[in-house]
């Protein structure tokens, strides 16, 4: 009965506000991810406001977007300089910047967050914007590891909240993970899927449907769609952690494990190379959050070697040393 009642409530709440096509987008966070998403959205004809509390970061991001577009022009408009200049001008006209999120979300169709990977900060942001955003506005997070359900809990628009996980560098990577919670309305989820496709991306759905699983497992798996790490990171991070454990147990050197996965599985990078690229601090942060959520899961157990390297501030390529040393 509780499950049925919940579905009825969901149906009422989601039908109260019909989601039209997403045309106006507010992106919170002027870092590399936020700027990349802004570039792709503007290139595909969306009106974009890029928001950050630091105006210098915004200016740097806008300059970075223009520089990225110039590289595109060199390839696509090599023999048509006027057309290339027109292309850049048209895309940049779709982008504006602001340091005040509250002043720009009143008429936006989508608020997409790409800020620091901290649950309380994300909750605080969305909780504040929920009070001033338009009723039809969809909220979405670009989190790579935090549960969308937890982030959405700070708002009153649970049916209009989802996840859009892009991959870096955004202009080049085709994949977008579209995440729905047990409260996300189908209309909202469909709007996020359509938006991803409008960006020229290939979306994968991280939202389970009751028709996809046996009836007797529905209650058990009702939150499967919001599993830690969604699809890519949920598979990738345990893979990298098991590589570390394999090395810790003395079953293979990091060099041999990397070579084995590149030549045997066809991966472009081995797990240790990938860890150094992602950042060991980032990997540890993700694992710590997962362990807290699911402490008995053997796939999510910590690694002494990883913890030691992070404690020594050896985060990988960005610090010059991780599992490998970099000049």
Regions of interest found by a model, annotated:
Residues 2-71, 132:
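NAD(P)+-binding Rossmann beta1-loop-alpha1 motif at the extreme N-terminus of oxidoreductases
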Residues 43-44, 53, 169-179, 288:
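Acidic/polar active-site rim loop that often engages polyanionic ligands
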Residues 53-88, 178-189, 211-215, 229-235:
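Rossmann-like dinucleotide-binding cores of NAD(P)H-dependent redox enzymes
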Residues 138-225, 230-233:
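Rossmann-fold dinucleotide-binding core
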Residues 53-60, 70-78, 83-139, 145-146:
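Rossmann-like NAD(P)-binding element
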Residues 14, 39, 90-110, 196-200, ...:
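Amphipathic alpha-helical segments at domain termini/boundaries
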Residues 2-23, 197-208, 220-226, 230, ...:
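NAD(P)-dependent Rossmann-like dehydrogenase/reductase catalytic/cofactor-binding core
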